């Protein structure tokens, strides 16, 4: 029997098991413990001849197949990963990509794209960014404008989630220029614009953001799909930043009325969340209308549950409690969120911290709360989140007025 080297034996074993849809317990059977099988797959144990014979029998193969060439493994695993979206196939794909240098660049591109999506689904922003950075580099090597634009668009979106606004503006701007210069599809151009409008607004580049939002809306006119809904949502969010709440509400409502939740339930839920946030940002706030949006979103949550969506709704409930003067409820919700691994974008995480400091100010810890808000505003400014920094200063001023003069009852923040 040939000596089978680790960790390649473990990788091959896991690939063969996954291809057959077997659990570790099913493959181990009566002749082996699942713990031992797990250590073999991870490369922690060297396989004995007896173990190899047992596993080959369970898999219905000859022991020599454990030496399977890795040259074709990326294509095989890519087929597995595209036909079955699971953590296990994605982990196999991640392993295959690590040793895939020299293989077909198009296969590597597909693999990196899928791995980025996998990390995004799990809310692992840093992991996603790592794969997308490699995807951007590989796209430049391949040289196809479509692939470059798509990789840069996704990369810009992940940078925005991490709060890295300057490189996000650069990546989204390059993706948009590629789409225009190479006359790429309307879909590619609109996808780049979705990110570009958001990051330009966050960087305080309002004239650019407005111009690009108009271009985006013109591009999706006549559609009623996910891209159309996202375009209206993005343009509406820009109106909110400019304080044009009535115009924002018209755009959000148009998207809610015209978009079928069966098309993309996650987008439908996020539109409801955006509308609820709008009702809380209006002057005066409309907590009852926000409550109705939250309830509609929560009713649909079991059908599209992700940690990020659950956390977005919990954050919204905390802000609603704050607006209604239910400070103990707001604190309890924030504490519960603080005990979980947050899967929220950078801006949403900062807004949670802002709310926590507002609650401190209103409970009498004025100096500590103000110092916390000042630090957050300065950090946002340093990260070029100009819009967010201005919002924090405005909320600090409103909160102080409310604490000192009880201005506007439950309407602050």
Give the location of each predicted region.
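Alpha-solenoid helical repeat architecture
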Residues: 67-71, 103-110, 143-154, 183-195, ...
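Short alpha-helical DNA-recognition segment
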Residues: 18-39
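Amphipathic alpha-helical segments of tetratricopeptide repeats
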Residues: 94-101, 133-140, 173-181, 213-224, ...
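Helix-turn-helix repeat elements of alpha-solenoid scaffolds
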Residues: 82-95, 120-134, 164-176, 202-215, ...
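A short, Lys/Arg-rich alpha-helix, primarily the initiator
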Residues: 1-19
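DNA major-groove recognition helix of helix-turn-helix/homeodomain DNA-binding modules
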Residues: 48-65
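Conserved small-residue packing positions in alpha-helical repeats and bundles
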Residues: 77-84, 116, 156, 197, ...
